[in-house]
């Protein structure tokens, strides 16, 4: 289950040494594939042929998706944390709902 969304700033927790510990914003989430695109991480070079819309063609750099297990969100202290889920009762309606929370600080991540 993917517990990340586009509003979270995250840190890359594993992988190549040049990218481990990098902090960036989650640009896109692919829940079916359990992958996310993080800004500035896993940048790949794509070669494009010249076409009518792109006269020159050439090389373009784009971020490629990485697995969600390699990404951790950043809590309010600026440290990498894990995400948990707990049921909280809504005081207005009396109904319970699931919320995501940071394991290190215990603060809720959902608005």
Swiss-Prot record:
Disulfide-bonded cysteine pairs: these are: none
CDD domains cross-referenced by the UniProt entry: KOW_RPL26 (cd06089)
In the record, the note on similarity to other proteins reads: Belongs to the universal ribosomal protein uL24 family.
Task: Give the residue ranges for region: Disordered.
Answer: 48-111
Enumerate the InterPro entries for this protein: Rib_uL2_dom2, Ribosomal_uL24, Ribosomal_uL24_KOW, Translation_prot_SH3-like_sf
Q: Could you tell me what this protein is called?
A: Large ribosomal subunit protein uL24
GO BP: any one term: translation
Record lineage? Bacteria, Pseudomonadati, Rhodothermota, Rhodothermia, Rhodothermales
Q: Which Pfam families match?
A: ribosomal_L24 (PF17136)
GO MF entries: rRNA binding; structural constituent of ribosome
- Cite the record's Polar residues compositional bias ranges: 69-80
- What PANTHER family has UniProt attached to this entry? MITOCHONDRIAL RIBOSOMAL PROTEIN L24
Please verify whether the record's keywords include NADP.
no
């Amino acid at each position: 289950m993917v517990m990340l969304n586009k509003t979270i700033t995250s840190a890359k927790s594993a992988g190549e040494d040049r990218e481990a510990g990098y902090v960036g914003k989650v640009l896109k989430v692919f829940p079916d594939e359990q992958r996310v695109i993080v800004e500035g991480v896993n940048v790949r070079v794509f070669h494009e042929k010249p076409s009518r819309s792109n006269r020159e063609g050439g090389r373009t750099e784009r971020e490629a998706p990485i697995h969600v297990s390699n990404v951790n969100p950043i809590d309010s202290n600026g440290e990498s944390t894990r995400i948990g889920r707990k049921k909280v009762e809504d005081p207005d309606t009396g109904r319970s709902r699931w919320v995501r929370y940071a394991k290190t600080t215990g603060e809720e991540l959902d608005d």
